[in-house]
Amino acid sequence: MNEQHAQSDRPPTVRPMDFLLVTGLSGAGLQTAAKVLEDLGWYVADNLPPELISRMVDLSLESDSRLERLAVVIDVRSRLFTGDLGWVLTELESKPVHTRVLYLDASDEVLVRRFEQVRRSHPLSGGGAEGTLSEGIAAERDQLAKVKAAADLVIDTSSLAAHQLRQKIEDAFGDAENRTMQVTVQSFGFKYGLPMDADLVCDVRFLPNPHWIPELRPHTGQSEDVRDYVLSQDGAEDYLATYHHLLDLTIAGYRREGKRYMTIAVGCTGGKHRSVAMSEALASRLGKDSGLNVRVVHRDLGRE
């Protein structure tokens, strides 16, 4: 009895905070990585001096809204960063954090081309007055050699486009929910204007309008009677099937490009009957894809 009571008094097990150190060569994609991590739900601190990392971890653990994921981007922009992170990692070993190090690399040729394209000097080249771009890259590579050797994951971005780097980071540091594509199906009425945030717009005004059926007019496309009427019209189901196939192709392309959000606008005259019914039906079809998180929004419902 006493043993059971003692067990019930034990504090619940707290999951260690995920902590990620992001470092690497200037021009290798550190800012892109930071943006991707933010999209994945990480709290990202950029260009933090090494001396403050341990303190920031402590504050993150002590705060009322305890962070679950913290990433710190550190590179040679911080003049206090000499390339030695061993002592930082040692300090973190005593804290309830799961620490990993991500290192981004790229070839000298690619880094030179990237710096020339954006017309910026390398942080270690002295703006061109004290050294060349190639010398700055070489100095940084030498300075970060130990960090690279200690990294849990090294990504060479030489041949990667931004969306390909995003995919690698999502695979390594995201979860199933983060990798799910967010799709919004939005009904609207053309007489109120096109939705400003729509990626795709389809027009279902080719279907007969339930507005002219007295017993259906008061109801919306969410009602069974209106839905059955709209979907029973010639071409309605064929249109849904064809448009769904088109969306499958489009969504696959969005995923390849690293896009995680899509808004599909379905319009009729007033946004009350046809667009509502067709949006619900389209969302139902899309919802069968486990890789999509689908929601329906009826923008103009109730405006009449």
UniProtKB/Swiss-Prot annotation:
Q: What Pfam families does the record tag this protein with?
A: PapZ_C (PF22740), RapZ-like_N (PF03668)
Q: Where does GTP bind?
A: 75-78
UniProt keyword list: ATP-binding, GTP-binding, Nucleotide-binding
Q: Which Gene3D superfamilies does this UniProt record tie to the protein?
A: P-loop containing nucleotide triphosphate hydrolases
Q: Has UniProt tagged this entry with the keyword Flavoprotein?
A: no
Q: Where does ATP bind?
A: 24-31
One GO molecular-function entry: ATP binding
InterPro entries per UniProt:
P-loop_NTPase, RapZ-like, RapZ-like_N, RapZ_C
Function, in words: Displays ATPase and GTPase activities.
- Name the family: Belongs to the RapZ-like family.
The identity of this protein, by name, is: Nucleotide-binding protein RHA1_ro07174
